[in-house]
A protein has these predicted regions:
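Acidic, metal/cofactor-coordinating or nucleic-acid-engaging core segments within structured domains
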Residues: 2, 182-228, 232, 236
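SIR2/sirtuin-family catalytic core signature
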Residues: 1-24, 32, 216, 220-320
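Short helix/loop capping segments that flank catalytic or ligand/cofactor-binding pockets
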Residues: 33-35, 116-118, 179-183, 244, ...
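A Trp-anchored, charged/polar loop motif used as the substrate-binding/catalytic surface
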Residues: 4-9, 83-93, 147-157, 210-223
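Short, solvent-exposed loop/turn segments at secondary-structure junctions
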Residues: 29-32, 112-115, 175-178, 239-241, ...
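Short, conserved loop/helix-junction motifs that constitute active-site signature segments
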Residues: 91-101, 162-165, 251-257
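Gly/serine-rich nucleotide phosphate-binding loop at the start of the catalytic core
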Residues: 1-120, 124-127
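Extended, H/D-rich, highly charged conserved domains that either
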Residues: 18, 22, 98-200
Length: 320
């Protein structure tokens, strides 16, 4: 792929982001180096790795809840990465034509840290944005999947116009460090809880029925989003070791109007992802690695995807 083709690809990605129903799948790679990957943790077995990972996620997320923020350099880099990414998503939604596609982006993440929530909270202090984490309630908030299908509009002070407010929907199938089981429901709290609702990354085989039901309900919600016409899914930081999510993506690709772009961290990742998925590329399913996007990318991260999407102009929405 020559330089001209690479620039054309970037333009195409920007165009899809503003003209299609926008979806993201964000995996644990996006929170590195603040939170290590499972394979980076020195331990005797997966059980010990899961335990050490959970402690690190709880510690890091606890720091994100403090005011003022006091973060290490690694934590600060990751937080600002998420903050910039979500700010660009908001800008894309503001440019989108709500008569063609909803001003909504779905963020589906297997991470159970609070980087996204903290970044969203920071953005909402200055910008108009609806954040939908699926919760219902005020003082006591419970997760309910029926809450995901909401759009919010601003009708003007004199009811003289209706303007859809941009919204970001967060779907967390692996749970979160601020989720607590309460009377067979999931309560979302503003603190790190003692026994959080978390699906361990090594799989669902040993999980209790309550967690298993939550996981598959969240998958169902996301599957419905990907089945919608004129949709695009960008995947970053995710290696498809979760077979359930991999199966969901392969099924979703059967929707001919869905475009899936998976971004690999390194040039070797394409073969790894395809092997994990037991799948092949096709017209609406592409895996992009650093060499596909430009010589300036030694690796490809969430911040690099942010940079590509942030270059959008109205010119990008026009047909070539």
């Amino acid at each position: 792929m020559n330089d001209s083709e690479k620039e054309s690809l970037k333009k195409q990605l920007r165009k899809l982001a503003i003209t299609k129903q926008l979806n993201f799948l964000i995996g644990s790679g996006a929170s590195v180096p603040a939170i290590p990957l499972m394979g980076m943790i020195d331990a005797e077995n997966d059980e010990e790795r899961n335990s050490k990972l959970a402690v690190k996620v709880r510690e890091t997320s606890g720091l994100l809840l403090l005011e003022p923020l006091i973060l290490s350099s690694n934590e600060d880099v990751v937080f600002k990465g998420y903050l910039n990414f979500l700010s660009v998503i908001l800008a894309l939604l503001n440019l989108a034509n709500s008569r063609q596609v909803p001003k909504n982006a779905n963020v589906f993440t297997t991470n159970y840290d609070l980087f996204i929530e903290k970044a969203i909270d920071t953005i909402m202090q200055n910008d108009r944005l609806v954040f939908n984490d699926g919760a219902n309630g005020y003082l006591t908030r419970y997760l309910d999947s029926t809450n995901y299908n909401r759009l919010v509009s601003y009708k003007g002070l004199n009811d003289n116009y209706i303007n859809e407010i941009p919204s970001i929907t967060l779907i967390k199938p692996h749970g979160s460090v601020n989720w607590e089981k309460n009377k067979e429901k999931i309560q979302i709290k503003n603190e790190i809880v003692e026994n959080p609702i978390i699906v361990e990354p090594t799989g669902l085989e040993s999980q209790e029925t309550f967690l298993n039901n939550h996981f598959h309900e969240m998958l169902r919600v996301f599957q419905l989003e990907l089945d919608k016409p004129q949709s695009v899914l960008f995947v970053i930081g995710f290696s498809f070791q979760d077979k359930h999510i991999g199966k969901m993506i392969k099924r979703a690709v059967q929707n001919p109007e869905l475009m899936v772009y998976i971004f690999g961290y390194s040039n070797d990742d394409k073969d790894i992802y395809l092997k994990n998925l037991e799948f092949t590329e096709r017209r609406n399913f592409k895996i992009l690695t650093p060499k596909d996007l430009g010589e300036e990318y030694a690796n490809f991260t969430l911040s690099n995807l942010t940079d590509i999407l942030s270059g959008i102009t109205l010119e990008d929405t026009k047909d070539d």
